[in-house]
Every structure is written in C-alpha cells, then in structure tokens.
Amino acid sequence: MKDQYDLVVVGAGPAGSIAATTAAKKGLSVLMLEKRQEIGEPVRCAEGVGKKRLRQHIELDEKWLCGEVSSAKIISPNGTTLTMAEEDAGSEVGYVLDRKIFDRTLVELSGEAGVDIMVKARVTGLIIEENTVCGVEMMHLGKTYSIRSKLVIGADGVESKVGRWAGIDTSLKPSHIETCAQFLVSGVDIDQSSCYFYMGNKVAPGGYVWVFPKGNNMANVGIGILGSRAGEKKPIEYLTDFVEANYPNGSIIEQVAGAVPASGPIEKTIANGLMLVGDAARQSDPFTGGGISNAMDAGLYAGEVAAEAIAQDDVSEKILQKYEKRWRGSFGNEIANNLIVKETFFSLSDEDLDSLALSIKDVDFKKMDLIDFIAALFKANKKLLWNLRPLFTQKLKQKFSGLTKFKR
C-alpha cells in the first residue's frame, strides 16, 4: 500500500465509489477505504431508485436488478389509495436493486478504473496542516497508518465523522433522524409492478411503512420513524405488527436496522482539502429518506471537481465551491422543498391525512401544477394549506428565479 495519493475516499457506498471511479478515470491516484469487511453489508434501504438517474451512472445488469416498478401506491390511514406513475412518484421509484450486489459492482468498476481499495480499514482521524485536510489516519488489521493526499472525500454515511473532524457541523437533532427497520419477507402476495407507502400515526408515527417488491413473492418491508416521535414502542415493533396484520402468511428471512438523515442539507459540505457526499453531507431526501440517486450524482460532481482542483494545484474551499454549487443546483431545491413537506405531513393527524387523500385521489398528477395542488389542498383542509405556505413561497421563488436567469 502506498502512503500518498492524489485523493482518499472514505466510504465505499454509491457516493464514494462513483466519486472514486470518476476521479480515477480523470487520471488521479485514488485510495478508497471501507470500514466494514464486506462491501454492501448491511443493507439499510428499501433498494428503490429512479430509472433515468441510475442509467446516467451505470449500465443495467440483471445480476443486481430485482425488479421494475411502474407505479407507487400511497395508502392513507383509512385505506384510501393514491396511485402515482413512476415519473411522478419520486427518485426511489423505478427499479428495485439488490444493494449487496449493486454496491459491489460499483466498487468493482472503481477497481477497474485503477482505484486502490481496502476493506476493514477504519479511518480514525484526519491529517490537517495549515487549516487544510491533507490525508487520513487509519487502522487496518490492527496496524495504524498515515496516508497523505491532496484531497479527501468523506462518504462515510449517516454516522459520518470526517466532516466533524474538519470542523463542519454535521450534527443531527432527533427530529432530523429517521430510525429505520426493514424485513425481507417471503410469501408476500402483492402487485410486483408497484411499490407501496403506508401513512398514519398508528402504523408509523412521524414516518411511513414502505413495501418494495423483489420478485418471487418477496418484498422489502420497512419502516422509518422520526427520532423525535419515537416513544416506548420501537420501530421494529411497529413493523412486526404491520407484517403480522398485512402479510399473515409471510416469513421474515432477513432483518436490519439503521438510521437515515432527514434534516435537509447541512450549511456547507466543503472545507479546505475536503468534500462530503451522500448521507455524510445529509443529501438524502428528508421526506422519503431515499438517497441512492442523490448520492451517485454527488459522487460524480465531487470526483469531477477533485480532478479540476488538483489539476489547478488548489484544493482550497474557494475552489471546492464548484462542487457545492453543482450539487445544490442539481437537486438541492428538491431537498429543501421536501424538508418542508416532511415537517408538515409528519405532523398531521390521521384525520388530516385521510381528508387530503380523499380530496386528491382522483387527480391526474401528470396534469397537476402548483395551482391545482393548492386548490386540492384548500378543498381538503385549509389548515394544511396554511401549514404548507413556506413550500409554495419557496417554489414560487425558485420558479421566478429560473425565469430571471433565462431572461439574462
């Protein structure tokens, strides 16, 4: 193992591997470090991802594709069902992945691009000189190593320490963390072309239950609950009750638990010599908790900017602003909007959720614009419309900001 690289990437999830591959293809020497002994383990997500954005990063392969969904069904507490086509249902609807194989495939592509990869490599600190990150301290097989680099990318997930070590505030309040549990359940008789989202305070207070088909009558059945809404009953207990009530003939064959940031993006994701990507940068969707597409996009931008900065021999925060601007300009508005949606919808009573669902269940979402949505909300619940006023204000600002830029 070398002791000096152009770039060190901490974490080998989708964000880290895409960043490493992108940088290596542009000629950088890259080391990617993963603290776990197996890539892709444990799986802590529903494994859904939108088609278009996935295909921008990797060619489809049946070995990690479990299925394809064409719609999302949202079920309110009283059973009212809203059906949305995949293009209207968010970045988690389209393909269902086998994340274990998918993540390993991304890392294999990194290796083919020339990236050095180490597993069971735990980063314990950063090397910081003259207020600039210039490497990492890490442990591997009981030994301590110092690896110097021109730049570090932190892709170390929701538990990220890399940003904090560099002085970036990545702290999360209980209301900004989704505590999650997921079962892989066999014997599930559902429409394999749809994924399902169950709302309501009885099934998931401050969150929702998801069901993603994986073929052969199997499905990922999971739950996410805001930490601020967690009471004595644990998420896994809510999930067990849901499975017993809805899939009495199902068998739980895998079980995982974890957490997802639901805070919206942190104030900044860069420092001198450092960029943060994916969950480490809190780039997941704060409403749905989904983050694969955003993570891959962020990894691409970070890898590109890493190559540009090193070519200029300048890894200052000023130069790395290119990364900050690219990802915020790409999907930052969507995250900001969905943070408002999360804070509104997760505070609603079951009666409000039912009222909203009944009001818009026959709406053609393809033809619905902001005015249609406001009208539907007004019909459903004036209080809800008032609570969502920050979202409407923000979306109007974004719309007219775009028009102003176009006119220029």
Curated annotation (Swiss-Prot):
SUPFAM superfamilies: FAD/NAD(P)-binding domain. Coiled coil: none annotated. GO terms for biological process: glycerophospholipid biosynthetic process; membrane lipid biosynthetic process. FAD binds at residues 15, 34, 45-46, 48, 99, 123, 279, 291-292. Binds 1 FAD per subunit. One of its GO terms (cellular component) is membrane. Its EC number is 1.3.7.11. GO terms for molecular function: flavin adenine dinucleotide binding; geranylgeranyl reductase activity; oxidoreductase activity, acting on the CH-CH group of donors, iron-sulfur protein as acceptor; oxidoreductase activity, acting on the CH-CH group of donors, NAD or NADP as acceptor. Its cofactor is FAD. It comes from the Archaea. Belongs to the geranylgeranyl reductase family. DGGGPL reductase subfamily. Is involved in the reduction of 2,3-digeranylgeranylglycerophospholipids (unsaturated archaeols) into 2,3-diphytanylglycerophospholipids (saturated archaeols) in the biosynthesis of archaeal membrane lipids. Catalyzes the formation of archaetidic acid (2,3-di-O-phytanyl-sn-glyceryl phosphate) from 2,3-di-O-geranylgeranylglyceryl phosphate (DGGGP) via the hydrogenation of each double bond of the isoprenoid chains. Reduction reaction proceeds via syn addition of hydrogen for double bonds. This is Digeranylgeranylglycerophospholipid reductase 1. It comes from Methanococcoides burtonii (strain DSM 6242 / NBRC 107633 / OCM 468 / ACE-M).
